[in-house]
Amino acid sequence: HGRVFPKTDKSRTIIQALENKIQELGASILTNTEVVSVKKVDKQFQVKSSDQTFTSDKLIVTTGGKSYPSTGSTGFGHDIARHFKLHVTELEAAESPLLTDFPHKALQGISLDDVTLSYGKHKITHDLLFTHFGLSGPAALRLSSFVKGGEIAHLDFLPNQSQENLKTYFEENREKSVKNTLKALVPERVAEFLAEDKADSKVKQLRPKDLENIISQLKGMEIPITGKMSLAKSFVTKGGVDLKEINPKTLESKKVPHLHFA
């Protein structure tokens, strides 16, 4: 999930770099030209638009997935792959916000920095946002690649603190209210949510099991995942042309010579 940005911090710089390379190679750019079909006749590819036919010895398909259709993605690249009898794996939403039943209604609008959201062996430490439907922000988007719905995720509000350290912290602040003690660790509304009806009690008044429960919530709140947003509302399509059928060095199809996917 590493990201690289141009020095200008502007997407236009990337576009210009691609355009410059295309011009350097003597190629043409056709805009407002929708490809309607692709086939191979003898040893050449035929690419048809509504009013033109283009032929080439090689074909590179870079149509993107089926997510984020406002960018022009329709999944047509998968249709091309299927036409050439290539295997297309199941398509799923990835880099998608997560839908939950709990606790987003109580915490809606709260953003958290550098928390750890995990499911099984997958642990993502990044920023997180509670929304009216569930979870968003980088941590949720990245975890979405590993869930479908029906899983239990765990949220660690304080990944840099151990449970033992937190026990010591509460003991050192035993004369303070539970809410104020928690407020020094997490946003106020999260503190109120975790303290429940003991917000105004002093830490020393908590039963051992109540304190243990608060610390457990801080280190691993259970969040049932009910699903994720549709492909149309996701940033990335998980799945596509089976990589077993693609040469990793050239991105060429192993079944169809000179057909590349990128």
Residue ranges and their predicted role:
Residues 29-33, 49, 90-92:
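Short loop/edge segments at beta-strand edges and connector loops
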Residues 1-28, 33:
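Conserved N-terminal/central alpha/beta ligand/cofactor-binding core
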Residues 31-44:
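A conserved short coil-to-beta-strand element within the FAD-binding core of flavoproteins
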